[in-house]
Amino acid sequence: MENQAHTTAGASPCEAELQELMEQIDIMVSNKKLDWERKMRALETRLDLRDQELANAQTCLDQKGQEVGLLRQKLDSLEKCNLVMTQNYEGQLQTLKAQFSKLTNNFEKLRLHQMKQNQSHRKEASNKDETPFELSSLNQKIEEFRAKSREWDKQEILYQTHLVSLDAQQKLLSEKCNQFQKQAQNYQTQLNGKQQRPEDSSPETPRLVCESSPGCEATQRDEFIIEKLKSAVSEIALSRNKLQDENQKLLQELKMYQRQCQAMEAGLSEVKNELQSRDDLLRIIEMERLHLHRELLKMGELQTVQDNRKRVESSYSPSTKEPERKRKELFSVVSDQPNHEKELNKMRSQLYQEEDLCSEQERMRNEISELTQELHQKEVTIATIMKKAALLERQLKIELEIKEKMLAKQQISDRRYKAVRTENTHLKGMMGDLDPARYLTVDFSNKEHSRHTSINKLEYENERLRSDLAKLHINGKAAWSNQSSYEGAGAYIYQSQLKTETGGDRISEDCEMNRSPTPLSPLPFQTKEMTSPLAGDNEVLPLSPPDISFRASLAAQHFLMEEEKRAKELEKLLNTHIDELQRHTEFTLNKYTKLKQSRHI
C-alpha cells in the first residue's frame, strides 16, 4: 500500500505539471492572437491613412490641372500682346538704325583724319624707340652681374669654411708635432744616460755580459722607435708646409675675388647712375610728347569747328525747313512718350506675371516629383510586406511539417505504449497463475531487492522528469517564441513516453528474473507483501500521456488554421491595395503625358 501511494503521488505531480504546461501554451497562443490582431488593426489604420492621402493628392492634382489651363489661356493672350509690341519696337529700331548709319559715316570721316595725324606722330616716335632697347640691354647686363656676384658670394662662403677646417687641422698637427718632439727629447735623454753608464762600468763588463744583453735589446727598440718618430715628424712638417702654401693661395684668390667684387660694385653703381639719368630724360620726353599731343588735339578741334561752321553757313539757306520738321517730330515724340511708358509698364507687369507662372510651374513639378517619390516608397513598402508575408508562409509550412513529424512520432510512441501495456498485463496474468508453493523455495530476499531497485529507479526518473519540467518552465518564460513551445511540449511528452516504456521493460525483466527459482534457504513471507509491488506497478503505468499530446496537437492545429486564414486575408488586402496604386499611377502618368503633349503642340 505504501508503494502504491508513493507511485500515485509521483504520477499526480507529473499530470499537474503537464496541465500547467498546457495552460501556459494556451496563454502563449492567446497572447500571439492578440498581437496579431493589434498588428492587423495598425496595418488597416495605416492603409486607410494612405488612401486618404492619395485621395487628397488626386484632388490637388485636379486643381492644379485646372490652374494650368487658366495659365495657358493667359499665356496665349500675353503672346498676342507681345507680337503687337514687337512690331512697334521693330519700327522704332528701323528709325534708330537710319540715325546710327548717319553717325557711323561721320565717325569714319573723323577716324580718317585722326589716322593721318597718328602717322605723323609715329614717325616722330620711331626715333625715340631706340632708347628703350638700350635700357633693356643694360637691364640684362645688370641681372648678369648680379647673378655672378651671387655665385662669387657662395664661393667665398665655401672658401671661408674650407679655411676654418684647414686651421683646425693645422692646430691638431702642430699639437701632434709638439708631442712627438717631446717624446724624441725624452728618448734622446734616456739614450744618453744609457751610453754614459756603459762607459763608467767598462772594467766590469766581463761579469755583466749576460746582464747587459736585455739592455741592448731595449736600446735597439728605442732607436727604431726614434727613427719612426723622426720620419713621422718630417712628414708632419711637410704636410704643414703644404697646408701653409694652400692657405696662402686661398688668401690670394680671396683677395682677387674681393677686388673683382669691388670693381663690379663700382660698375653697377655707374650703370645705375646712367639708368637714372636716362629715366629722367625719358620722363622729360614723355611730358613734351603729351604737351604736343594736347596741342594737336586742340588744333584738330579748332579745325573741326571751322569746318562745321563753313558747312552750316553753306547749308543754312536750304535747311531752314528741316529744323521745323524736327521740332514737329520732337513734339510728336513727347506726346507719345506717356503712351510708351504705359505700354512699358504693361509689359513689365506681364513679364512679372510670366515669372510668377514659371515659378508656380516649377513648384508643381517639384510637387509631382515628390508625389512620384512617395508612390515609389509605397511600392517599396508593399514589396517588403509581400516578402514578409512570403516568409511567414514559409515559416508556417516548416512548422506544419515539424508538427506532422511530431504527430507521427506520437503515433509510434502510442503503439509502443500499447504493446508494453499488453505485455504487462500478460506478465501479471502469468504471475497470478503460478503456484504459491513454488514461491516458498524462491529467494525472496533477491526478489524484493530487485523490485526495490526497480522502484527506486522509477522514483529517480520521476524526480529527474520533475526537474526537467521546472527547467523547461523557467526557460519558456524567457526564450520561447512563435511555436517553439509546441515543439518543447511535444519533445517532453515523447521523452516521458520513452521513459515509461523503459520503466515497463525493466519491470518485465524483473518479473522474468523472479520467475526463475533458486534453491536457497526458504524464508517466511506473506502473500500480501508479494502482491503489493505488483499492484503498485500496475498503478504506475497508466499516466495517460496520449491524452495530453492529443490536446496539444489539436490546439496547435487550430492555431495554425487561424494563422493561415489571417495570412490569406492579408494577401487579399495587399493585392487589392497594390492594384489600386497601380491604377492611380497609370492615371496620373497618362494625365501628365497628355499635358506635356498639349504643351509641345
UniProtKB/Swiss-Prot annotation:
Residues 115-135, 188-213, 307-326 are annotated as: Disordered. One of its GO terms (cellular component) is cytoplasm. Its main location: cytoplasm. It is found in: Cytoplasm. One of its GO terms (biological process) is centriole replication. Residues 121-131 have a biased composition (Basic and acidic residues). Keywords: Cilium biogenesis/degradation, Coiled coil, Cytoplasm, Phosphoprotein. Key structural component of the deuterosome, a structure that promotes de novo centriole amplification in multiciliated cells. Deuterosome-mediated centriole amplification occurs in terminally differentiated multiciliated cells and can generate more than 100 centrioles. Probably sufficient for the specification and formation of the deuterosome inner core. Interacts with CEP152 and recruits PLK4 to activate centriole biogenesis. This is Deuterosome assembly protein 1. It comes from Rattus norvegicus.
